[in-house]
Structure formats: structure tokens, C-alpha cells
Design a protein with these regions (language model features):
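Active-site anion-handling motifs in enzyme catalytic cores
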Residues: 1-348
Length: 348
């Protein structure tokens, strides 16, 4: 039997559908390879501060320690406690981790960078979700890096009738990042207004219906504001079930999202995407999937460029979907190769 302890974002953000999608997808893929299999969830923040001896002893009772995915290479999770990392005796696997830095925020400190270096030196296997993060690690002297894509790309879907869609209309999913980010105080309300105006145009121009794809509880504030502006929209909120949200993403004809995992779930569902970026990770992932020209910096976003990029993306839907299918097949091959490497660790 293979026993895995998996540290990722859980306690604070487990109501964030993207974080749930990451955790469940990694768990499910490991379960399919490591049979029989036991799984112990851990909170990533437990690795940041000194812990009693029993904490590390519990980790070392397992066969493998998985850390990730998500944007763990960021100021929010670093530095990790060096003594804990050095005391982990079982193989460490870094799974699909990404670099995260809000637009307008500071670079990582040297202490945080050294923590990343230590973590990767101690790891038996390192994987990242995009090419930028791979380049970042290689610049730190970490050479053996597997680029596998975000784990949540491969999340299964579960049918749901939570949102009843009109088959006669073009279905556009939208998402606004309403948790705190560096430029949030200045740009949140302007971007809600610009989104609303762009959606009004798309409703009339494309005969579209708008579906708000809620990733975080705070986003219901966005829905409330948009409805006060008389924007007709349906709301999908499947938390804490990410499988159902993935199903709804697959029903969309276009997604205009801000949250990182709005982009990930759309790509995983084969749905064309426009991204309004508030973080470097948005650019990095969209470039990784060949869609960098579909990114709008939140500082420059207005109804006109949201409309322009949305129409351009929608008009090219056939080619985008074809390219997404091909890239997803390639990434699944990489994912399987990485899972095979993990399975060999459990038998050594």
C-alpha cells in the first residue's frame, strides 16, 4: 500500500473552488496510479512555522510527501521552515507548482528565493505548471524540472443541472477576482463596471446569455453589483464541488475570467478564454497555452478592449478548441510520465 501526505492550500482557501480543484485533481490522479492508496491531507501553512517533533514524525510515517500545486512560489507561502523541510526523510514531490506575484507587488526577497531553492534541492521530483516557472527555477540552478501543466486541467467533471442554460443563445461565462490582490483597492469597482458594459454589448451583439462562474464566496458581491446595474445573468456556484463547476465550464462558448483557475478550468474543458490579468501567473499560464494575445492587463481593461478581445476569441473558437485538444493530449502524456515517476518512488 502507498501512503501519501499532501500539503496544499486548504484551511483558509478551501472555499475557493480553484484550490479545491487542485487538491482533488492531484489526489484523484495519485489514487489512479498508487493502488492500494491512502491519502492524508495537510495544510501548506503548517510547513511555514516551527512544529513539534510529532509533526515531522507523522510526515515520515508516510511513503511520499507531495507539496503543491497552486502558486506556492509567492510571498504568501514563503519562506517555509527550513528545519521542517530538512527533517522530511521520505521522498518529497513538488506537484505542478506555479510562480505567483500580483501586478504592482514586490519581487520575492532573497530569503524567500533561498527557501524555494532548498525545497527543490530536497525534492526527489519537481514539476511546475508553466514554462515561466520552469525558467524561474532553472535560473536558481534547479535543472531537473518537469513542465506538466496545472493539475486542475485534468479534473473530472460531474453533471449538474444547477444552472439551466438556453440552448438558443451563446453562453458566456464570466468571473471577477474579488479576493484581495495588490491592485484591488484601485481597480475592483472600475473593472466590475467595464465588465458589465461589455456584457451588455455581447448580450445584444451575439444573442448571448451571461453566466457568472463563482470561484470564491466574495464574488457574490460582484453579482449583486452587476444585478443592480440591471445586467441579466445566471449564477453558477458549486462550492465545495469542483467537478460540477468543471461540467458547467464545458457548457460555455466563451469565458471572460480573472481568477487563475477560471482560465485553467476553461482550458481543461476546451472552452475559449479571455483573461483579465491581475497577477503575473495569468500571463504565464495564458502564454503556456498559446493564448497570450487574449490577456488584458487589469490596469488597462475597459469595455472596448474586453469587447474586442472577446469577439476576436469567439470568432476563432474552432481553431482555439482544436489547439486546446492537441495541447491537452500532450500535457496528459507529460502528466502520466510524472505519475509513473511518482509510482516508482513508492516502490523503492
Amino acid at each position: 500500500m502507498s501512503s501519501v501526505i499532501h500539503f496544499c492550500r486548504r484551511e483558509e482557501d478551501f472555499y475557493n473552488i480553484g484550490e479545491i480543484a487542485i487538491a482533488y485533481s492531484i489526489r484523484d490522479m495519485l489514487r489512479s496510479r498508487l493502488k492500494p492508496f491512502t491519502y492524508t491531507p495537510g495544510e501548506i501553512k503548517e510547513l511555514e512555522n516551527p512544529q513539534p517533533t510529532e509533526f515531522v514524525e507523522t510526515i515520515n510515517q508516510h511513503d511520499i510527501c507531495v507539496i503543491g500545486g497552486g502558486g506556492l512560489y509567492s510571498k504568501f507561502f514563503l519562506p517555509m521552515n527550513a528545519q521542517i523541510i530538512k527533517s522530511i526523510e521520505i521522498p518529497i514531490v513538488l506537484y505542478g507548482i506555479g510562480y505567483l506575484r500580483n501586478l504592482g507587488d514586490n519581487e520575492l526577497t532573497q530569503e524567500q528565493i533561498e527557501s524555494i531553492r532548498l525545497l527543490n534541492v530536497r525534492a526527489k521530483l519537481t514539476s511546475v505548471r508553466d514554462e515561466y516557472t520552469c525558467k524561474f527555477l532553472r535560473n536558481l540552478g534547479i535543472s531537473d524540472v518537469h513542465v506538466i501543466g496545472d493539475p486542475a486541467i485534468f479534473l473530472d467533471s460531474e453533471e449538474t443541472s444547477q444552472v439551466v442554460l438556453d440552448d438558443s443563445k451563446i453562453k458566456i461565462g464570466i468571473n471577477v477576482a474579488c479576493h484581495y490582490w495588490a491592485l484591488y483597492p484601485k481597480y475592483l469597482y472600475p473593472i466590475i463596471d467595464e465588465y458589465t458594459k461589455a456584457c451588455e454589448f455581447l448580450i445584444n451583439h451575439l444573442n448571448a446569455e451571461i453566466v457568472y462562474l463563482a470561484h470564491h464566496p466574495d464574488e457574490h458581491h460582484v453579482v449583486e453589483i452587476m444585478r443592480k446595474k440591471k445586467l441579466p445573468l445566471k449564477v453558477a456556484d458549486t462550492s465545495p464541488n469542483p467537478y460540477k463547476m468543471k461540467f458547467i465550464y464545458g457548457k460555455m462558448d466563451l469565458v471572460i475570467g480573472m481568477m487563475m483557475h477560471s482560465t485553467v478550468l476553461a482550458f481543461g474543458s476546451g472552452t475559449p478564454i479571455v483573461n483579465v490579468a491581475y497577477d503575473a501567473k495569468n500571463y504565464n499560464f495564458m502564454e503556456f497555452i498559446g493564448q497570450k494575445d487574449k490577456v488584458i492587463d487589469v490596469r488597462n481593461a475597459d469595455q472596448e478592449n474586453i469587447k474586442e478581445v472577446s469577439l476576436r476569441t469567439f470568432d476563432d473558437s474552432k481553431n482555439i478548441k482544436r489547439d486546446f485538444r492537441a495541447l491537452k493530449r500532450e500535457l496528459w502524456t507529460r502528466q502520466e510520465e510524472f505519475l509513473t515517476k511518482i509510482s516508482k518512488l513508492s516502490t523503492n
